[in-house]
């Protein structure tokens, strides 16, 4: 398996509260996930070391269509793509000319976005906790019930009825934070966004 430079994300994604009377993190998360089927946003991703200092910043565009389809287009500092069509997740490093493919269920540790794609029973697989409000966002914490999750926890930050931020803590103690801007939901997305074929001449690795 090649060493990829992905800072994933993550992540994670969906949106919108149905009622302010729903006060548990489980009900808020469910309302958030059920209220929209598509999403498009710009994102900035910052990877932090164990002391909380920024190590690398990246950014690009994110697209999601539930269930199971998402796409991260990284444009800086390196060109990378992460594409799920609902069956496989493709990781493409443009500069290294390398592609790896994973089955959707195997990709959670690499693409936390899968958690909110509608493909997993969250309450069966994660402990869901209320983290209160900070930086103007209401935070929900997801902790894997299995040690094989590939990460310690994921935080989802909601600002009103919009996805505003995410934080991933991996098993090596590193934090990845993602901030969203120019977010739109309930829009029509081009089906081609979620299609991927490895370009000619690239190295392709596939997890069995």
Curated annotation (Swiss-Prot):
GO biological process: lipoprotein localization to outer membrane; lipoprotein transport
Transmembrane segments: none
Alphabetized InterPro entries for the sequence: LolA/LolB/LppX, OM_lipoprot_carrier_LolA-like, OM_lipoprot_carrier_LolA_Pbac
One cellular component (GO) term of this entry: periplasmic space
Signal sequence bounds: 1-21
Any Pfam family matching the protein: LolA
Main location: periplasm
Domain of life of the organism encoding this protein: Bacteria
Subcellular locations according to the entry: Periplasm
Keywords: Chaperone, Periplasm, Protein transport, Signal, Transport
Cell membrane among keywords: no
Family label: Belongs to the LolA family.
HAMAP family: LolA
Subunit structure: Monomer.
Chain's role: Participates in the translocation of lipoproteins from the inner membrane to the outer membrane. Only forms a complex with a lipoprotein if the residue after the N-terminal Cys is not an aspartate (The Asp acts as a targeting signal to indicate that the lipoprotein should stay in the inner membrane).
Protein known as: Outer-membrane lipoprotein carrier protein
Species annotation: Methylococcus capsulatus (strain ATCC 33009 / NCIMB 11132 / Bath)
Gene: lolA
């Amino acid at each position: 398996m090649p060493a990829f430079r992905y800072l994933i994300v993550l992540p994670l994604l969906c949106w919108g509260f149905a009622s302010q009377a729903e006060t548990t993190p489980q009900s808020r998360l469910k309302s958030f996930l059920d209220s929209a089927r598509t999403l498009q946003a710009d994102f900035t991703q910052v990877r932090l070391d164990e002391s909380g200092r920024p190590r690398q910043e990246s950014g690009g565009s994110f697209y999601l269509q539930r269930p199971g389809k998402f796409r991260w287009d990284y444009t800086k500092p390196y060109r990378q793509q992460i594409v799920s069509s609902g069956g496989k997740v493709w990781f493409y490093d443009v500069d290294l000319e390398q592609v790896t493919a994973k089955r959707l269920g195997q990709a959670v540790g690499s693409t936390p976005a899968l958690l909110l794609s509608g493909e997993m029973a969250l309450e069966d697989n994660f402990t869901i906790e209320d983290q209160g409000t900070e930086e103007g966002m209401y935070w929900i914490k997801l902790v894997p019930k299995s040690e094989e999750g590939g990460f310690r926890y994921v935080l989802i930050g909601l600002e009103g009825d919009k996805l505003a931020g995410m934080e991933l803590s991996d098993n090596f103690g590193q934090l990845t934070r993602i901030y969203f801007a120019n977010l739109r939901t309930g829009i029509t997305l081009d089906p081609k966004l979620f299609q991927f074929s490895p370009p000619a001449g690239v190295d392709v690795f596939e997890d069995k």
